[in-house]
């Protein structure tokens, strides 16, 4: 008996949509183990749909964990005037495509009927952004100085723990003197944290969106940097922080008068923190409250600046992408490209699920924090079982369109921040590897000179002393091949199907694979306390395929055994013999 209340399918949205104009993706959610088999039929629609004839194709289950089972239809032909029927054991789902719309009817033993309608038009098709694959973030103020200091008096390296208004001399010229770093890392683009005029080092309290901060250089130097980046086949992305108001007159009135200020409702802040000396830190840079008319006016001014002065700067300099911080706090259409540069890509930062914002063409791509938190709960906080993590990843994977997930720029984090959060335990590098092999595009945050830890404040981090150089070198030695591997296996990691091989809660062991065009990558992550032995014979390798260690490219054999240490990972490849 199928539980009807557990059946979920919403035409279009992320349950039924066109992937590329030739392929239709359909997803159906049922209660765990309710549907043993799923099959679909496709045929040209006639006046007698009951006479549909077609070859039957079976669909594999995508997720099967403690959460309700998710079953998907990976591919089927999409033609105007065609019809598709999907069967789940006793449950029949009938989808009829006509010239104008799609009728979807759920039937249970021909007695229970749910009706849906869906318009599938060419203008509704969403195409993925093919140019995005590797992006490295850069915190310019503490990255590297490249000769003469542009402005201000920088602090000597390691003199003190940095505060919001401390400056270490990093500027745009330093980016041009670091080409060997970018070449070694093999990145496709550089994302600069805010570089517009602001008093702090993090620049989130922007004063002028139309000029480069003197700490970093000037407009001429910026154009030169962008030009040199383009010469090396790379792209550049800027950070827009219109959601913060900086040190404006209205905010200063709140700081001075507190509850009695006429502007106190303009901002989101904790009043008690204003009385503390730390109020200059980023966490206390106010965020605008979108429901207040005054802040809407301020945001309008920001958008005018974006469409005039800032847009002129990025269009003439050749900037490729602009990230909009906390885009969900803005109104609709605020993320659309300006008329001055319609070909610029807009990346939206979302603190929750980003897919709904992409469906409405608010911006081109996005990154969502729930993915980051899911990874952390497995490797750092250790508050969830492996099966819960797998289920959550399935839900994230199935929540949106595949072409959207393929270009989601979720933050991969920096090797320095990872070491800080895990207390210096370098085995936590598995966290970086885990993130890079799932369905998303990695964006590495490399904000500081080698030797900075990543303190969780939005100004520069603290400096490492003693053995910091050796630790950083070991981290870099891990990150470089990781980036190279992501570049080499980009097709598999972008388009490949995800299949969970083993999710063992008792021993904290997870294994899954990514498969694309005959090539399979198999991953093993072990967070338990004992050494885990993996016998390759248990993988049931076909005789016409070879297996190898994908990290070292060393050939392996059917009778080999791979030992995975606690907190470590292993990575195997399987493909046909050349």
UniProtKB/Swiss-Prot annotation:
UniProt entry tagged with the keyword Hydrolase: yes
Reaction catalysis annotation: hydrolysis of (1->4)-alpha-D-glucosidic linkages in polysaccharides so as to remove successive alpha-maltose residues from the non-reducing ends of the chains
GO biological process, one term: carbohydrate metabolic process
Record keywords: Carbohydrate metabolism, Glycosidase, Hydrolase
Domain of life, per lineage: Bacteria
Residues spanning the membrane: none
GO MF terms, alphabetically ordered: glucan 1,4-alpha-maltohydrolase activity
Function recorded in the entry: Converts starch into maltose. In contrary to other maltogenic alpha-amylases BlmA cannot hydrolyze 1,4-alpha-glucosidic linkage next to 1,6-alpha-glucosidic linkages.
Family membership: Belongs to the glycosyl hydrolase 13 family.
Stated name of the protein: Maltogenic alpha-amylase
Gene: blmA
């Amino acid at each position: 008996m199928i539980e009807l209340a557990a059946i979920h399918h919403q035409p279009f949205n992320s349950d039924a949509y066109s992937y590329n104009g030739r392929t239709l993706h359909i997803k159906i959610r049922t209660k765990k183990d309710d549907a043993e088999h799923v099959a679909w039929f496709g045929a040209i629609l006639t006046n007698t749909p009951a006479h549909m004839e077609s070859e039957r194709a079976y669909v594999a289950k995508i997720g099967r964990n403690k959460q309700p089972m998710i079953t998907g239809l990976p591919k089927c032909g999409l033609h105007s005037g065609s019809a598709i029927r999907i069967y789940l054991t006793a449950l029949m789902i009938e989808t009829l495509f006509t010239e104008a719309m799609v009728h979807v009817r759920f039937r249970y033993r021909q007695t229970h009927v749910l009706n849906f309608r869906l318009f599938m038009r060419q203008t509704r098709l969403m195409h993925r952004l093919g140019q995005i694959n590797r992006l490295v973030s850069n915190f310019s103020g503490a990255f590297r100085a490249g000769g003469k200091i542009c402005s201000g008096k920088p602090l000597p390296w390691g003199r003190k723990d940095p505060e919001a208004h401390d400056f270490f001399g990093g500027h745009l010229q330093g980016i041009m003197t670091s080409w060997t770093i970018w070449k070694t890392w093999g990145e496709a683009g550089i994302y600069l944290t805010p570089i517009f005029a602001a008093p702090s080092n993090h620049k989130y309290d922007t004063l002028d969106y139309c000029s480069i901060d003197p700490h970093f250089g000037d407009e001429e130097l910026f154009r030169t940097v962008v030009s040199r980046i383009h010469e090396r086949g790379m792209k550049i992305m800027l950070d827009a922080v219109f959601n913060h108001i900086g040190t404006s007159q209205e905010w200063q009135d709140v700081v001075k008068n507190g509850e009695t200020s006429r502007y106190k409702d303009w901002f989101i802040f904790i009043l008690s923190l204003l009385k503390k000396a730390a109020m200059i830190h980023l966490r206390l840079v106010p965020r605008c409250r979108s429901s207040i008319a005054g802040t809407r006016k301020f945001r309008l001014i920001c958008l005018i600046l974006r469409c005039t002065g800032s847009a002129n700067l990025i269009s003439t300099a050749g900037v490729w992408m602009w990230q909009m911080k906390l885009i969900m706090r803005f109104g609709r259409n605020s993320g659309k490209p300006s008329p001055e540069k319609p070909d610029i890509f807009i990346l939206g930062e979302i603190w929750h699920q980003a897919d709904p914002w992409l469906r409405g063409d608010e911006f081109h791509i996005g990154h969502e924090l729930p993915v980051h938190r899911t990874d952390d709960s497995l490797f750092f906080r250790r508050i969830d079982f492996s099966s819960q993590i797998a289920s959550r990843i399935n839900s994230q994977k199935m929540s949106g369109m595949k072409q959207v997930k393929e270009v989601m720029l979720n933050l991969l984090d920096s090797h320095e921040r990872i070491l800080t959060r895990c207390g210096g335990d370098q085995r936590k590098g598995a966290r970086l590897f885990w993130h890079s092999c799932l369905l998303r595009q990695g964006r590495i945050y490399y904000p500081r000179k080698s030797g900075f830890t990543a303190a969780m404040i939005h100004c520069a981090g603290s400096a490492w002393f003693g053995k910091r150089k050796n630790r950083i070198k070991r981290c870099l030695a891990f990150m470089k091949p990781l980036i190279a591997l992501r570049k080499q296996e980009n097709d598999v990691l972008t388009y490949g199907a995800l299949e969970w091989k083993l999710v063992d809660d008792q021993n904290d062991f997870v294994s899954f694979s990514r498969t694309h065009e005959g090539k399979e990558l198999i991953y093993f992550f072990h967070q338990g306390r004992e050494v885990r032995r993996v016998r390759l014979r248990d993988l049931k390798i076909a005789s016409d395929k070879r297996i190898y260690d994908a990290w070292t490219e060393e050939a392996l054999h059917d009778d080999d055994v791979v030992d995975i240490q606690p907190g470590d990972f292993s990575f195997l490849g399987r493909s046909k013999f050349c």
